């Protein structure tokens, strides 16, 4: 049995593989079935793919949800997939586009906006993925979804090639392909996503990312170091259970009334992230091992077990 209990990896996903391909390879390398990823990337997209190992799959929803991308938009072309892998629908000149008009356009997309997902996407329609209906040539429209663009920044404008390089910091559920399409429409010439790299997801950034291990070198030296889940959850407050009675009650899923003064990092905020409830904390034992997550309540201060791991560490 593999000795890994729980933790995270950050993979720098290469182009050409699905997120599930990466998970399958890691399952074979580690000999563990319980491995999941935190946020699907299209095969052509590269960059940060957070991987949860073992019981850490239960922690994914407690990680910070905003994501950051660096992408390139090709102006003058519209496709059925909203990127350059699709069939061309129309082509137009971008000669009239100037840098100031791009900056003004990008400003209109900052904040909360409604966005229609691409028809070639994994959105469900009556129990079926949208891309399956699109492949059959069916005509349909997807309803707009409310998303949030926290930051959108112009990195470079190449007038000759008609390409816009930009950085986007956004809420989950944002389609950068749709953003490329809509920016092209507002600029009056159409646009499609040419390239995309995710540089941050679930609190992990590209500097932490490693290359996907090679299956042909399946040995202990080839297994990347697992990131301690407490590091991934450092945005949450923490409390330590110190007595046998406290640990016993925790194992049994009982509420514990404790002193609030035992809280570590009690004043915390997750900026612009409404997806993580502000009432959760990590629970550790005397060896500083994560033994679960709890919901905390005021007056009296008590913790209610939400996720319980082995209290022995």
From Swiss-Prot:
Xref: InterPro entries: PsdUridine_synth_cat_dom_sf, PsdUridine_synth_N, tRNA_psdUridine_synth_TruB, TruB_C
Isomerase found in the keyword field: yes
One Pfam family of this chain: TruB_C_2
Active site positions, chain numbering: 42 (nucleophile)
Presence of keyword NADP: no
EC code(s) of this entry: 5.4.99.25
Any one GO biological process: tRNA pseudouridine synthesis
Xref: PANTHER family: PSEUDOURIDYLATE SYNTHASE TRUB1 (PTHR13767:SF2), TRNA-PSEUDOURIDINE SYNTHASE (PTHR13767)
Protein name listed in UniProt: tRNA pseudouridine synthase B
Organism whose genome encodes this protein: Prochlorococcus marinus (strain SARG / CCMP1375 / SS120)
Lineage: Bacteria, Bacillati, Cyanobacteriota, Cyanophyceae, Synechococcales
